[in-house]
Amino acid sequence: MHRARRLHSLCDVLRGVAHASLLFAVAHVPGGPRAYHAVTRGLLRSQHRVIRKLRRVWPGYARVWRERCGLELDGRTIWVHEPGWVPFAPLASYLLSGRGGVLTSAAGPPSDRYVAASVRAILESELAAEGAADPVRHARIAALVDADAAAVLSATSTAIATKVDPSSLPLDTGSVDLCHSGGTLEHYRPEVLAAFLRESFRILRPGAVASHVYDHRDHLRHVDGRWPFLLHMALPDDVYRVLFGHGLMFHNRLAPAEVMALFDAVGFERIAARRFVLPDKRYVDGGAAEAGEAGVPRWVGSGRLARLSVEDRHTAAIHYLYRKPERS
């Protein structure tokens, strides 16, 4: 039985290697990354899956901000960093706060293509069903179903900065009550991540909240669900740099303790580190080793895996919640 289990794991690895080889080739062909994104966003409709996911997870975020962080959202300025190509974030922020939010992105603005789907998703979500917005906000969003992305930003009074450098952001000091990102920080090299956290500390008001969902999983897990989700941590740094250092696959591979240390170094106060476990796909405040499956087989212990605690080896992602101290 033990041998069969190892053979099954080896087959998963070989499948993942095949996917990684394809992405490596695409990343190094001129125009390859652009063509790859065109295929995934167009033919494979990946952004519609993103919209469905955002519709599912944002109500939970809103509850956490209110209940765990003690942040009343009405009238607050919500900043979403790297919202992606769908205009879900400005609609959700407006529904929750009733005032214009802020978007920052290293790429361009949201696409017109996904406006109607985003509007419908917001109106059908728990955010609207729970009465999070008054009728005026609800009606204003409903009227945008046939609009373009620019009209969405205008109607919700959302400010946007594109082509930004995350280490030097064009936002005013002390101007935001909540900064949120999802699936972004793990793509930053450690020095860039540290600089972004310093910038966000500057931009947040005293008492404001930093909310970042950091996916600790190997990116190949998104390509093949059978891939051991922490296997990238087993690779030597030099090998990882050569094989996965390109834009389609790079992950900074920081351990949870290393991520927390970066928040601490800036001056943030920790509220919670909610661990996301599989296969149940739920957050736990503790006991991840008992609640979730392991990200690699127990017998694998090479590379950066030595930096992980038992809890870390059973953690797929973490929702890091921090506060800027009132006196800062």
Name each model-derived stretch.
Residues 166-179:
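A short acidic, Gly/Pro-enriched loop at the edge of an enzyme's catalytic core
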Residues 241-256:
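Acceptor-substrate binding/catalytic loop of class I
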Residues 95, 99-159:
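Class I S-adenosyl-L-methionine-dependent methyltransferase module
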Residues 261-264, 270-328:
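A C-terminal cap/extension of S-adenosyl-L-methionine-dependent methyltransferases
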Residues 73-85, 209-236:
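Conserved class I S-adenosyl-L-methionine
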Residues 194-206:
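A short glycine-rich, Lys/Arg-flanked "PGG" loop and its adjoining helix->strand segment in the class I
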Residues 181-184:
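A short beta-strand submotif of the Rossmann-like class I SAM-dependent methyltransferase core
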